[in-house]
């Protein structure tokens, strides 16, 4: 039965994702908080928060789900040609706070951002605990793009990305999936397909299939050096 659950601060357990509403697609629960334990529990079970600034906390598990398999990303010839001309550098976990702040910047066609200071602090706590990570794109020591998300076993749960220079967020996504493949990750959760992700080859799979993959991979192991502060390269 599809129904909406209401969480209180003491209730850590989420209802099964299969109970999420059909419309709006994937809305599962309302309320609770953004404590690290609750956030980790959510991602471990295929659930993520998304809500506007004036809304209560909303928890989602949409059907279908957007995913990438590291190593299978689609890169157009024109994008390869463009990126080969750029003298950009790429780093892991060098500027997590700056990346989340970049993702929170207002974008064209949007009234505002859902990434509030509360959201930024919640994911910063997860970063300090070793669960949330960032990838940065630099041009002449200036941050021009990046992304952040959570590592859950062999799954990377992407949260948000941004760019201040054309194609910088696409470059970040390409570098991320190449890095994840090298480190032993098997899946990237991209949540919901959009034109930007679709252009990179994101696939839509049924929620049930995603949850089965997640259950198989969420306790898997990856390289211990996966999230060491480092500079990484792009392979084109």
Swiss-Prot record:
One of its GO terms (cellular component) is cytoplasm. NCBIfam families: aat. It is an enzyme of class 2 (transferase). One of its GO terms (molecular function) is leucyl-tRNA--protein transferase activity. The gene is aat. It is found in: Cytoplasm. It comes from Shewanella pealeana (strain ATCC 700345 / ANG-SQ1). It catalyses: N-terminal L-lysyl-[protein] + L-leucyl-tRNA(Leu) = N-terminal L-leucyl-L-lysyl-[protein] + tRNA(Leu) + H(+); N-terminal L-arginyl-[protein] + L-leucyl-tRNA(Leu) = N-terminal L-leucyl-L-arginyl-[protein] + tRNA(Leu) + H(+); L-phenylalanyl-tRNA(Phe) + an N-terminal L-alpha-aminoacyl-[protein] = an N-terminal L-phenylalanyl-L-alpha-aminoacyl-[protein] + tRNA(Phe). Belongs to the L/F-transferase family. Its EC number is 2.3.2.6. InterPro entries: Acyl_CoA_acyltransferase, Leu/Phe-tRNA_Trfase, Leu/Phe-tRNA_Trfase_C, Leu/Phe-tRNA_Trfase_N. HAMAP family: Leu_Phe_trans (MF_00688). The keyword Acyltransferase applies. Keywords: Acyltransferase, Cytoplasm, Transferase. Functions in the N-end rule pathway of protein degradation where it conjugates Leu, Phe and, less efficiently, Met from aminoacyl-tRNAs to the N-termini of proteins containing an N-terminal arginine or lysine. This is Leucyl/phenylalanyl-tRNA--protein transferase. The keyword Oxidoreductase does not apply. One of its GO terms (biological process) is protein catabolic process.
């Amino acid at each position: 039965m599809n129904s909406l659950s209401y969480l209180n601060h003491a209730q850590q357990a989420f209802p099964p994702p299969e109970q999420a509403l059909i419309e709006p697609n994937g809305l599962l629960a309302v309320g609770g908080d953004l404590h690290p334990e609750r956030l980790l529990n959510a991602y471990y079970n295929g659930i993520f928060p998304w809500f506007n600034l004036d809304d209560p906390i909303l928890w989602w598990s949409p059907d279908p789900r957007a995913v990438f398999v590291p190593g299978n990303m689609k890169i157009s010839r024109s994008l390869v040609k463009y990126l080969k001309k750029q003298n950009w550098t790429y780093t892991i976990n060098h500027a997590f706070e700056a990346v989340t702040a970049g993702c929170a910047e207002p974008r064209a066609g949007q009234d505002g951002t859902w990434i509030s200071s509360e959201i930024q602090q919640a994911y910063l706590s997860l970063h300090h605990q070793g669960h949330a990570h960032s990838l940065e794109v630099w041009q002449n020591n200036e941050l021009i793009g990046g992304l952040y998300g959570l590592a859950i076993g062999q799954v990377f749960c992407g949260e948000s990305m941004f760019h201040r220079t054309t194609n910088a967020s696409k470059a970040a996504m390409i570098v991320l999936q190449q890095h994840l493949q090298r480190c032993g990750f098997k899946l990237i959760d991209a949540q919901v397909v959009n034109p930007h992700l679709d252009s990179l080859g994101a696939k839509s799979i049924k929620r049930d299939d995603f949850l089965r993959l997640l259950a198989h991979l969420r306790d898997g192991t990856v390289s211990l050096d996966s999230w060491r502060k480092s500079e990484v390269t792009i392979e084109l």
